[in-house]
């Protein structure tokens, strides 16, 4: 190859096979896509060692993508169950999967995940550090943290979430500006704790050039984590969040100079009225880099329903610039999600993503809705099921409550507006009282 990374290829005017695949999926000219990749406005996470990958693009002008989180924990250490979740995510066409495993030796699961998955795979190396070395967090050295990141890259992870922006300056801002929920990012809290316990700079910030060496070697996309994302609406858009975002913007430029692709991670919890400005701030401070948001969750009072609170926020966020939505399940804030929780979270996130694509005018987005409208007009139930975002649920609901007439459902019966308008426009009688028609 005459290039090191997708961005390097794009800057050299080389169209990669990954670019060709993404351009075809997005119905766009591959040269236009290449230009966006060269400028960092689109990322195509594609580790050289992820052989089963079916690449996707994330960023400006493309369909909004979704990510599914899964992974093993100390309380739920069941690799087979997590692999079932992987298959569920693949079957439901999630574009990305993040392995958030945080207990024990995680490499076996990570390798199996990457081997079987056509979806983009992301990981958070700091979660793995304690188990990787069997050492207490404070005893892990800066070089050892970087070695864990390299192992994940070597395994084939397409993007690594690293909370590089939690540096001493961001930490000082956090200390001066008390929060209700402090730091709720798992990786961010671990790094902050390590820095405080050792009185040292963030090892990934201090060793950022070495981290870029790793990313360039394997063509890993760097997902710059938001350690200071708000964990409740009271903490949103505060000094700590913005201080870190400024740092992420500076780090983005350094990464691009090395031809390393970047995604910026974002909030978090915030009220509806703050979402649009947060998207604009990120795009401004981080130079148009793709934005990856968790939600945002728009109210804190709905445990058990946070797939809904996040879908509301995600739709608004993606309408105003977010490119990548991390799914949230009904189990958020309560427990590890099961397969049913996963399905609910994926569907909610996909609805939010598609709704935003409609609002943004993404090419081809309306075709799906237009096809559904025509199927409904024609009372073509089979076609409606095929077009449904959750075909199984749509079929089950109709089967559970059968109408006497195939032309209607049990909501309206023969008073169905669609049925009656079709009949009248075709010159037919309505026959409201007869059961034989």
From Swiss-Prot:
One BP annotation, GO: thiamine diphosphate biosynthetic process
Catalysed reactions, as listed in the record: 5-amino-1-(5-phospho-beta-D-ribosyl)imidazole + S-adenosyl-L-methionine = 4-amino-2-methyl-5-(phosphooxymethyl)pyrimidine + CO + 5'-deoxyadenosine + formate + L-methionine + 3 H(+)
Alphabetical UniProt keywords: 4Fe-4S, Iron, Iron-sulfur, Lyase, Metal-binding, S-adenosyl-L-methionine, Thiamine biosynthesis, Zinc
Cofactor, free-text remark: Binds 1 [4Fe-4S] cluster per subunit. The cluster is coordinated with 3 cysteines and an exchangeable S-adenosyl-L-methionine.
Matching Pfam families: ThiC_Rad_SAM
Chain sites annotated for binding Zn(2+): 269, 333
Record carries keyword Lyase: yes
Protein name in UniProt: Phosphomethylpyrimidine synthase
Phylogenetic placement of the source organism: Bacteria, Bacillati, Bacillota, Clostridia, Eubacteriales
UniProt gene name: thiC
């Amino acid at each position: 190859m005459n290039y090191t990374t997708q961005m390097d290829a794009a800057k050299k005017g080389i169209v990669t096979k990954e670019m060709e695949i993404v351009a075809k999926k997005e119905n766009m000219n591959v040269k236009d896509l290449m230009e966006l990749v060269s400028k960092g406005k689109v990322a195509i996470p594609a580790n050289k060692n992820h052989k089963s990958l079916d690449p996707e693009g994330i960023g400006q002008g493309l369909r909004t993508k979704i990510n599914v989180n899964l992974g093993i924990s100390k309380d739920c250490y069941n690799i087979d169950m997590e692999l079932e979740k992987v298959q569920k995510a693949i079957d439901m066409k999630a574009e990305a999967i993040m392995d958030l495993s945080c207990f024990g030796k995680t490499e076996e699961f990570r390798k199996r995940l990457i081997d079987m998955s056509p979806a983009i795979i992301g990981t958070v190396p700091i979660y793995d550090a304690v188990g990787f070395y069997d050492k207490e967090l404070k005893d892990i050295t800066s070089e050892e943290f970087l070695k864990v990141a390299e192992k994940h890259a070597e395994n084939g992870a397409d993007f690594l979430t690293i909370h590089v922006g939690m540096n001493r300056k961001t930490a000082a801002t956090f200390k001066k500006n008390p929060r209700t929920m402090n730091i709720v990012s798992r990786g961010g809290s671990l790094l902050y704790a390590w820095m405080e316990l050792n009185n040292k700079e963030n090892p990934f910030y201090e060793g950022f050039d070495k981290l870029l060496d790793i990313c360039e070697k394997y063509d890993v996309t760097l997902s710059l984590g938001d350690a200071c994302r708000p964990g409740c609406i009271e903490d949103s858009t505060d000094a700590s969040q913005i201080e870190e975002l400024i740092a992420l913007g500076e780090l983005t430029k350094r990464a691009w100079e090395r031809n390393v692709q970047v995604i910026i991670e974002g909030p978090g919890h915030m009220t509806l009225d703050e979402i649009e400005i947060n998207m604009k701030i990120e795009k401004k401070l981080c130079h148009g880099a793709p934005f990856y948001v968790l939600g945002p969750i728009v109210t804190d009072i709905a445990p058990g329903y946070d797939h809904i609170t996040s879908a509301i926020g995600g739709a608004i966020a993606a309408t105003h610039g977010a490119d990548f939505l991390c799914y949230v399940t009904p189990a958020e804030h309560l427990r590890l999600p099961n397969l049913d929780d996963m399905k609910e979270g994926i569907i909610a996130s996909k609805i939010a993503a598609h709704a935003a694509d409609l609002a943004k005018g993404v090419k081809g987005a309306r075709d799906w809705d237009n096809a559904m409208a025509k199927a409904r007009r024609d009372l073509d139930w089979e076609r409606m099921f095929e077009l449904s975002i959750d075909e199984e649920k749509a079929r089950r609901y109709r089967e559970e409550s059968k109408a006497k007439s195939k032309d209607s459902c049990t909501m309206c019966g023969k008073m169905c507006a669609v049925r009656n308008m079709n009949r009248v426009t075709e010159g037919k009688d309505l026959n409201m009282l007869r059961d034989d028609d």
